[in-house]
């Protein structure tokens, strides 16, 4: 409940910031992931969704715990972070949340349903 309220508050707080400018399409993301090894690929879906399939090199931090766990799991606030979910709604909310938390090099990859490249299953 509290996490939901925080997400709604953050969404409203950053509604004026054009998060669409932070979008990256799958082909550009793939090119960069293949050449830049320091990019963090962040999956904000549930653990169940992650186990079913995810993009290789992904780090799972579900949206409902992102505000609480970001500082520990994503200590470098200047690192390039590509955020994705299933359809793009949670990734957009996650980008807004991370902006509020001080992260500055964010890209909204959108949904894995638009990812035409290899995915893997399992926990890691």
What feature does the model see in each segment?
Residues 1-28, 32, 39, 47-80, ...:
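Rhodanese-like catalytic fold shared by cysteine-dependent sulfurtransferases
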Residues 84:
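Short, surface-exposed ligand- or partner-binding patches at beta-edge/loop junctions that are enriched
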């Amino acid at each position: 409940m509290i996490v939901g309220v925080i997400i709604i508050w953050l969404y409203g707080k950053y509604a004026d910031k054009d998060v669409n400018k932070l979008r990256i399409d799958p082909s550009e993301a793939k090119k960069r992931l293949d050449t830049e090894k320091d990019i963090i690929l962040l999956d904000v879906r549930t653990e169940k969704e992650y186990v079913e399939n995810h993009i290789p090199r992904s780090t799972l931090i579900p949206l409902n715990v992102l505000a609480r766990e970001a500082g520990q799991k994503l200590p470098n606030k200047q690192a390039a972070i590509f955020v994705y979910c299933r359809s793009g709604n949670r990734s957009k909310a996650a980008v807004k949340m991370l902006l509020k938390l001080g992260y500055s090099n964010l890209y909204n990859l959108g949904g894995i349903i638009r990812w035409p490249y290899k995915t893997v299953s399992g926990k890691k």
